[in-house]
Every structure is written in structure tokens, then in C-alpha cells.
């Protein structure tokens, strides 16, 4: 999968906001809130091919977290990204 074009990640206090901008995005008024971990993952894979395993490995490599916990967290994150329509399956 890939992140969709037309989104800009912006810091807002301790959170991050993914803002829809540009012609590629149908609803430019949408904003998606992310915590710092989700924002880190977004920045690491933005514009690149990735899968759940890529995100799991990034979590394990950067935080002291078990593979099982990372897999559960990535599952929740990907569901939210897909629901928000900010990623596309290639």
C-alpha cells in the first residue's frame, strides 16, 4: 500500500494533524489527528510502498515493544488510515 498524495502532516501541540490539500484529495476540508507514534510511522512510509510488516518493524526498531503488541497496534492504525481514506492498496 501507499499513502495517498495530497496530505500534509503538521504538528499541533503534542499531536499531529494530517491535512488534506491539493487536487488529489476529494474533500480538502478533512483533517486527521495523529499521536507522535502514528505521525512517525506516516513520515517513514510517506510516498513509499509499505505493508503492515514494515510498520511493525519500524515500531520494534524504535521502541521497546513486543512483536505481538506492535502487530495489534499496526492493525488498529491501518484500519483507521483506511477508514479515513489516506492510504491506497496497490
Predicted segment positions?
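Acidic, low-complexity/disordered tracts enriched in E/D and polar residues
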Residues: 1-43, 90
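Long, charge-rich, low-complexity alpha-helical segments
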Residues: 30-90
Amino acid at each position: 500500500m501507499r499513502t495517498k498524495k495530497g496530505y500534509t502532516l503538521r504538528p499541533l501541540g503534542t499531536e499531529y494533524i494530517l491535512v488534506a490539500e491539493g487536487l488529489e484529495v476529494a474533500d480538502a476540508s478533512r483533517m486527521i489527528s495523529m499521536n507522535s507514534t502514528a505521525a512517525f510511522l506516516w513520515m517513514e512510509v510517506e510516498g513509499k510502498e509499505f505493508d503492515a510488516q514494515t510498520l511493525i518493524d519500524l515500531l520494534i526498531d524504535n521502541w521497546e515493544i513486543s512483536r505481538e503488541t506492535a502487530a495489534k497496534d499496526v492493525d488498529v492504525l491501518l484500519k483507521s488510515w483506511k477508514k479515513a481514506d489516506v492510504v491506497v492498496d496497490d
